[in-house]
């Protein structure tokens, strides 16, 4: 697990590149440990942005050594269809389409009209408290 102070340092380094830290995940895929950073930027994330963030973060991780053993660092954009986990994610996605799943297996789709610290509102629907949401993500209608 990444400590709070290390995560704050990572966030500051990402911001120094003109980007924002969207999410940070520690996963295991095919027996490999992966530290995956998702970054966003107002005008979109480029490959150069990802490389710059990776180059800045790597020395910090070498010193802080937040993970036991070998791991791979991956830096990318969360993509057009991205998970919504925090109020800031919903606020950043105003006007976008979202699919929200509830614990009772029901789901709803719609355009995000408003979001605050406690709930999200889809166009034509009542506000939905985050506590009722099991999983949510933006989606693009192709």
From Swiss-Prot:
Subcellular location: Cytoplasm
Keywords, ordered alphabetically: Cytoplasm, Ribosome biogenesis
CDD domains the record matches: YlxS_C
InterPro entries per record: Ribosome_maturation_RimP, RimP_C, RimP_C_sf, RimP_N, RimP_N_sf
One cellular-component annotation, GO: cytosol
One of the GO BP terms on file: translation
Broad class of the protein's primary localization: cytoplasm
Pfam family, any one: DUF150_C
Function: Required for maturation of 30S ribosomal subunits.
Stored PANTHER family: RIBOSOME MATURATION FACTOR RIMP
The family this protein is said to belong to: Belongs to the RimP family.
Protein name: Ribosome maturation factor RimP
